[in-house]
């Protein structure tokens, strides 16, 4: 098995939306650049000091890529605030909130600030539960209320119940805080109710022992979690899961963008389904893009029963078997519906992308996996070593991915939780010690137009078969055998250029290329 080193992969976001069928008319396309990954430095905030490293660069491309949709961080606009409130450890809540007579507590300032105003929290430590709820005014889209930490302002656990920062009002911006949970079993930040336009940005959340650093629940709608460093949330008892971000049932339209989330005992992001504990409707409308996820005890992203999820342009790596997990990087299971996984870089794991498996109720439907780069997936330490695995699901589409340097590139139809119904697998570069391991439960499989390494084995119902036998039993008359010969930034070889079939994604040239990277734009 080959190992790839460095930043080889590319990221492109095609224009097609979540569609259960991708076989629409494709088109020639112009290319574009891709957004940077992970936390970007912002002066005078805790993320200004985050060490720069190559994993924050945009995923490399040999040329511009068609259909890019991932949204880059925008530069902070200059704002003229209508009033400034000042909070200081040396202040007094009886003051007028000016620089000369600052307030003592953040909560007092929260109760006073109005649309278009800013609360400047001076350097120091504030042991309080910050509640932006019935005590606070709502901002407006044109005049948000900003809660600004300055000089490393630090929030630690204070008296009261619930998360350390509780957001229940729309159009508030929480910016630039060190939120230190001090190993207590608490959420760092919670969003609930109508929080449209409310944002947690440019902050460092660390060292918690509760369910997550950030959570959305109780019909939380429209929250944005952007450009934060989230790390060190660990539980060592009970279910041992302490996640970076948990999106709970009834949440809607949540965005998780450009965060670094790592070294937690749970997942970087989990969309939690209601199965097993609730009759509430699932979360709907989750966007996870441009993040850097690595080194958790569990997964990078875990999508349970949630609807309308987009996971794109993320870099995810360093997930190996642990005492509580198998080393899967990205998991979509239970009754997830309409989930788009595109343009991600996934490497150094025990399994790259897994669809199906655990089941409670209907199987996953409308899952689209496209233009991902999955490589260096290993069975070391007891891992499975699978690039992409499809189990119980219906209509899963796997197109234009590059799967390289794996123990087994693709597994389908082994019956875990039920059949892999009507999967579509086209235009993929497939390389592994075992290229494809196909079980007996993949009714309606459409397999073709893939470039498959000649060095890999084929398995059918657990038995090694010849390539010709495999193609005959699967009806694959269009896949070709050839070395991937991947070049700089995972550019495909001539065997893959213009050799794909139109699956509804924009392309450049006479026909789509096979694999995740499109040349010629």
Show where each model-derived region lies.
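Bacterial N-terminal signal peptides
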Residues: 16-27
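Surface beta-loop-beta hairpin patches that serve as ligand-binding interfaces in beta-rich domains
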Residues: 59, 67-75, 464-521
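Detector for repetitive beta-architecture
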Residues: 84, 116-118, 129, 144, ...
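Acidic Gly/Asp/Thr-rich repetitive segments characteristic of extracellular carbohydrate-active
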Residues: 89-131, 513-516
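Extracellular beta-strand-rich solenoid/capping regions of secreted or surface-exposed proteins
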Residues: 107, 111-115, 127-146, 154-197, ...
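Predominantly extracellular beta-rich ligand-binding scaffolds that present long acidic/polar faces
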Residues: 129-131, 142, 340-346, 357-489
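Extracellular beta-strand/beta-solenoid scaffold signature
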Residues: 131-135, 158-165, 183-192, 208-217, ...
